Curated annotation (Swiss-Prot):
The RuvA-RuvB-RuvC complex processes Holliday junction (HJ) DNA during genetic recombination and DNA repair, while the RuvA-RuvB complex plays an important role in the rescue of blocked DNA replication forks via replication fork reversal (RFR). RuvA specifically binds to HJ cruciform DNA, conferring on it an open structure. The RuvB hexamer acts as an ATP-dependent pump, pulling dsDNA into and through the RuvAB complex. HJ branch migration allows RuvC to scan DNA until it finds its consensus sequence, where it cleaves and resolves the cruciform DNA. Belongs to the RuvA family. Residues 1-61 are annotated as: Domain I. Residues 136-140 are annotated as: Flexible linker. GO terms for molecular function: ATP binding; four-way junction DNA binding; four-way junction helicase activity. This is Holliday junction branch migration complex subunit RuvA. Keywords: Cytoplasm, DNA damage, DNA recombination, DNA repair, DNA-binding. One of its GO terms (cellular component) is cytoplasm. The gene is ruvA. HAMAP family: DNA_HJ_migration_RuvA. Residues 62-136 are annotated as: Domain II. Has three domains with a flexible linker between the domains II and III and assumes an 'L' shape. Domain III is highly mobile and contacts RuvB. It comes from Tropheryma whipplei (strain Twist) (Whipple's bacillus). It is found in: Cytoplasm.
Length: 194
């Protein structure tokens, strides 16, 4: 079993990378969200999958991501490719939150996962992802929320830097604001700056 690989990233292909380790290039399938520079030193936590007709190595930036992958492939109807597609769209914290909340909608955003399979995933992973920290989810949501508001301000004609500064200023004062309130306060902030 190969638990991890450390080496020089030789090539990046859609859905896979080649990691050179002591002169041997390992083809490793990775989530679409994994995108380091070529010639960078990388460490991937891996899961070796042996099938009748193939041997494939799947790699992840964190042990947590690899653990969630291995939990996903235990579910009937979820093979390594579907599990990889899920981790290309959702973070481990988002998968765990969906399972914890019994909400299959985030999983349905993944290509190849319909309502029935999403429901099966939520049902079968219940209680199995307790090691996944959920506090990251709130931080990720805050970043997503900020990015959405910055994009809205750019759409209204403001520059990216001033939009980001306005949103940051508003959120420094009050983190509990709703998106419309943040947008409104950011517009007020920008109007005062002119």
């Amino acid at each position: 079993m190969i638990a991890s690989l450390s080496g020089l990233l030789e090539a990046v292909r859609p859905g896979s990378v080649v990691v050179n380790m002591h002169g041997i290039g390992f083809l490793v399938r990775v989530p679409q969200s994994f995108n380091p520079e070529v010639d960078a030193e990388v460490k991937l936590y891996t899961s070796l999958q042996v099938r009748e007709d193939s041997v494939s190595l799947y790699g992840f930036a964190s042990v947590l991501e690899c653990t969630v992958f291995e939990q996903l492939i235990t579910i009937s109807g979820v093979g390594p490719r579907v599990a990889l597609a899920i981790l290309s769209v959702l973070t481990p914290a988002e998968v765990a939150a969906a399972v914890l909340e019994g909400d299959d909608k985030p999983l349905q955003r993944v290509s190849g996962v319909g309502k029935k399979l999403a429901g099966t995933i939520v049902l079968q992973l219940a209680g199995k992802l307790t090691s996944v920290p959920l506090e990251n989810r709130k931080q990720e949501q805050a970043v997503d929320r900020s990015a959405e508001i910055v994009q809205a301000l750019i759409g209204l004609g403001w520059q990216r830097q001033e939009s980001a500064a306005a949103v940051e200023s508003v959120l420094e004062k009050d983190q509990s604001l709703t998106m419309p309130e943040i947008l409104r306060n950011a517009l007020r902030y920008l109007a005062k700056q002119e």
